[in-house]
Curated annotation (Swiss-Prot):
UniProt note on tissues of expression: Heart, skeletal muscle, liver and kidney. Expressed at lower levels in brain and pancreas and at very low levels in the intestine and white adipose tissue. In skeletal muscle, levels were lower in obese than in lean subjects and fasting induced a 2-fold increase in levels in the skeletal muscle in obese subjects.
Motif (LXXLL motif) on chain: 144-148
GO biological process terms held by the UniProt record: adipose tissue development; brown fat cell differentiation; cellular respiration; cellular response to oxidative stress; circadian regulation of gene expression; digestion; energy homeostasis; fatty acid oxidation
PTM text: Phosphorylation by AMPK in skeletal muscle increases activation of its own promoter. Phosphorylated by CLK2. Heavily acetylated by KAT2A/GCN5 under conditions of high nutrients, leading to inactivation of PPARGC1A. Deacetylated by SIRT1 in low nutrients/high NAD conditions, leading to its activation.
Start-end of Basic and acidic residues biased regions: 219-237
MF (Gene Ontology): chromatin DNA binding; DNA binding; DNA-binding transcription factor binding; lncRNA binding; nuclear receptor binding; RNA binding; RNA polymerase II-specific DNA-binding transcription factor binding; sequence-specific DNA binding
Region listing for Mediates interaction with RNF34, in residue ranges: 350-798
Induction, as annotated: Transcription is repressed by ZNF746 which binds to 'insulin response sequences' its promoter.
Native organism: Homo sapiens (Human)
Name this polypeptide is given: Peroxisome proliferator-activated receptor gamma coactivator 1-alpha
Region (Interaction with PPARG): 293-339
Stretches with biased composition (Basic residues): 563-578, 622-631
Gene Ontology cellular component annotations, sorted alphabetically: chromatin; cytosol; nucleoplasm; nucleus; PML body
Length: 798
């Protein structure tokens, strides 16, 4: 960890000194050391060779350098004594430790922000104001190409680094190694390269060219196009610098990686060296993109020609129109820029879910405008937001007037044609509905007409895909056979019901998918009506006679609702078959009138309910939601427990009272039986009622109770309890006189157990007095001996 921190600090200070040397200014090593004298530093020593050696892209000679640093003392610090050198080392160590480190663990190079070399807005001294290099610059890339594209076996000497950078590196490594000394060695190769580079030292063009190579993402032969692109982008950046969108566009367009390492990688490179694949793209990307905090990670040199994975988010739109898109090596950038540049282009309606569903089968005409339109009719109840209509009141009035004209023209239509319109098939109703919509939309503006036509096409496609909902739209006759005799009254009703008249479309939307409709609309099988909408009572005329002037909700409320919802519930289909039965004599379909002869039960129930519950707000709900059928609601569990205990206690008390009453009745019956006041009457007719039996036997006296028990075998009987015993004896003696000519004789007994047994039983109470043990003797007991002997002889002869 200490070695990593040491390397980071040394690299940071080394980069600061190197950039200062490139700029050509005598800058202090650190702002905290103003007393450091760097006047003896020769800037001319920083030629291309030494600069390339200082960058240390490939650190194959790092060990050689570290060994050579220990040979000779430094030439720059000859005038500094050892005490000052020790103090300087301590201050440098403290300063290097205080350098900021970014999120990736690398020191941030703030010193480059003041230079004119790393910014593309300020080109190198040799470049023209418009960003194009001078003509003599065409020969210079050849030297750099030789240096950058040197073969792997070529050994570049890093010993010719500037004394300042080398001393700084050595001083920092002093914390880990021995006190390093800096030596400046020269060999034949370095002298030759230095002599070549010294011819161009006054202009410092190799350094500027090197920076151009460092900041480009293309191959070295593409240096000039890259400069042109960078210049144009820099101009755009300077004009739009205040906009963050422009900055993120520059981040996309600017290349931020190096194309090639300064020295080619050799097979024997030490991969574990701290200087492996060192790049300065992080510093350059900070300056070029214009966003100081956005520093993407370093891209390896072998991925230089691939797409930049750290481009900005594509959601940001470009505001700079002068940026030249990158070449074909980055097609994603150009595509995203071209797509994001069209700010006015919105997501087309053809990408909606409805279009995605319909486009699978056929292509609709006018596909761009028809999905933007919404339903051209008002909605009575709430629906989904994407289905609600936002038409103006003018179109509603036009549709109302058109419907009035159609209804007046077809006023005298025959009832037979009306019946035929009711039983037409769903396919014919679709075609009639489309024709009626086209005719009713002629007087509307062309825009609304086109919208309605497109809406009809969408509906036709929906019917084709998902099946036609039964009677979802009006029939041809059902839309046009309304009769309005009183125009003032009709206009009043139309003003109350504007949503039912818009060429049939509102009726579709009315019964689509609103859950509240089940509570607000009326059901013919339920006998209810929605009186929150219609406050005019039905006619009081006979229910089986057609009354054209009767005022009631439109027929569409009662018939179209269950027909529309047949697919959702089977009860709706049952009502559909019932509502079209012959019990319904005539069915007018105008919102102003309806035949009151739908069915006997329906009219009676609805008429009675309307009279009794007309102004009741609870009547809007269904009958099943009456207050009597609702369970009580409790505020707390304790209240529920209390109510439950009360109910149980009441039930126990009721059962106790009932048992007491039953016991009392049983005691009274037993007492009446003991008192001989109960008479059993048997063999009565099966059709005899209790009232008839009571009336016939009441001639003998006052009767307290009379019951009749009927049996399947015809042996019916009854019990009559008289108030007095004497009346019971009179009925027992003279009851046979009440028999009619077509009846059998009554069996009259005093009530007891004996009437429930058969008469041939020997243990019956009625036969107890006649029982005699002697009666069981045979006929032979009365014969004498001679008679018995003769009988025996006759039996033997047989």
């Amino acid at each position: 960890m200490a070695w990593d921190m040491c390397n980071q600090d040394s690299e940071s200070v080394w980069s600061d000194i190197e950039c200062a040397a490139l700029v050509g200014e005598d800058q202090p090593l650190c702002p905290d050391l103003p007393e450091l004298d760097l006047s003896e530093l020769d800037v001319n020593d920083l030629d291309t060779d030494s600069f390339l050696g200082g960058l240390k892209w490939c650190s194959d000679q790092s060990e050689i350098i570290s060994n050579q640093y220990n040979n000779e003392p430094s030439n720059i610090f000859e005038k500094i004594d050892e005490e000052n050198e020790a103090n300087l080392l301590a201050v440098l160590t403290e300063t290097l430790d205080s350098l900021p480190v970014d999120e990736d663990g690398l020191p941030s190079f703030d010193a480059l922000t003041d230079g004119d070399v790393t910014t593309d807005n300020e080109a190198s001294p040799s470049s023209m104001p418009d960003g194009t290099p001078p003509p003599q610059e065409a020969e210079e890339p050849s030297l750099l190409k030789k240096l950058l594209l040197a073969p792997a076996n070529t050994q570049l000497s890093y010993n010719e680094c500037s004394g300042l950078s080398t001393q700084n590196h050595a001083n920092h490594n002093h914390r880990i190694r021995t006190n390093p000394a800096i030596v400046k060695t020269e060999n034949s190769w370095s002298n030759k390269a230095k002599s070549i580079c010294q011819q161009q030292k006054p202009q410092r063009r190799p350094c500027s060219e090197l920076l151009k190579y460092l900041t480009t993402n293309d191959d070295p032969p593409h240096t000039k196009p890259t400069e042109n692109r960078n210049s144009s982008r820099d101009k755009c950046t300077s004009k739009k610098k205040s906009h963050t969108q422009s900055q993120s566009q520059h981040l996309q367009a600017k290349p931020t990686t190096l194309s090639l390492p300064l020295t080619p990688e050799s097979p024997n490179d030490p991969k574990g060296s701290p200087f492996e694949n060192k790049t300065i793209e992080r510093t350059l990307s900070v300056e070029l993109s214009g966003t100081a905090g956005l520093t993407p990670p370093t891209t390896p040199p072998h991925k230089a020609n691939q797409d930049n994975p750290f481009r900005a988010s594509p959601k940001l739109k470009s505001s700079c129109k002068t940026v030249v898109p990158p070449p074909s090596k980055k097609p994603r950038y150009s595509e995203s820029s071209g797509t994001q540049g069209n700010n006015s282009t919105k997501k087309g309606p053809e990408q909606s879910e409805l279009y995605a569903q319909l486009s699978k089968s056929s292509v609709l005409t006018g596909g761009h405008e028809e999905r933007k339109t919404k339903r051209p009719s008002l909605r009575l109840f709430g629906d989904h937001d994407y289905c609600q209509s936002i038409n103006s009141k003018t179109e509603i009035l036009i549709n109302i007037s058109q419907e009035l004209q159609d209804s007046r023209q077809l006023e005298n239509k025959d009832v037979s044609s009306d019946w035929q319109g009711q039983i037409c098939s769903s396919t014919d109703s679709d075609q009639c509905y489309l024709r009626e919509t086209l005719e009713a939309s002629k007087q509307v503006s062309p825009c609304s007409t086109r919208k309605q036509l497109q809406d009809q096409e969408i509906r036709a496609e929906l019917n084709k895909h998902f099946g036609h909902p039964s009677q979802a739209v009006f029939d041809d006759e059902a839309d046009k056979t309304g009769e309005l005799r009183d125009s003032d009254f009709s206009n009043e009703q139309f003003s109350k019901l504007p949503m039912f008249i818009n060429s049939g479309l509102a009726m579709d939307g009315l019964f689509d998918d609103s859950e509240d409709e089940s509570d607000k609309l009326s059901y013919p099988w339920d006998g209810t009506q929605s009186y929150s909408l219609f406050n005019v009572s039905p006619s009081c005329s006979s229910f089986n006679s057609p009354c054209r002037d009767s005022v009631s909700p439109p027929k569409s409320l009662f018939s179209q609702r269950p027909q529309r919802m047949r697919s959702r519930s089977r009860s709706f289909s049952r009502h559909r078959s019932c509502s079209r039965s012959p019990y319904s004599r005539s069915r007018s379909r105008s919102p102003g009138s309806r035949s009151s002869s739908r069915s006997c039960y329906y009219y009676e129930s609805s008429h009675y309910r309307h009279r009794t519950h007309r102004n009741s707000p609870l009547y809007v709900r269904s009958r099943s939601r009456s207050p009597y059928s609702r369970r009580p609601r409790y505020d707390s569990y304790e209240e529920y427990q209390h109510e439950r205990l009360k109910r149980e206690e009441y039930r126990r008390e009721y059962e106790k009272r009932e048992s007491e009453r039953a016991k009392q009745r049983e005691r009274q019956r037993q007492k009446a039986i003991e008192e001989r006041r109960v008479i059993y009457v048997g063999k009565i007719r099966p059709d005899t009622t209790r009232t008839e039996l009571r009336d016939r036997f009441e001639v003998f006296g006052e009767i307290e109770e009379c019951t009749v028990n009927l049996r399947d075998d015809g042996d019916s009987y009854g019990f009559i309890t008289y108030r007095y015993t004497c009346d019971a004896f009179a009925a027992l003696e003279n009851g046979y006189t009440l028999r009619r000519s077509n009846e059998t004789d009554f069996e009259l007994y005093f009530c007891g157990r004996k009437q429930f047994f058969k008469s041939n039983y020997a243990d019956l109470d009625s036969n107890s007095d006649d029982f005699d043990p002697a009666s069981t003797k045979s006929k032979y007991d009365s014969l004498d001996f001679d008679s018995l002997l003769k009988e025996a002889q006759r039996s033997l002869r047989r």
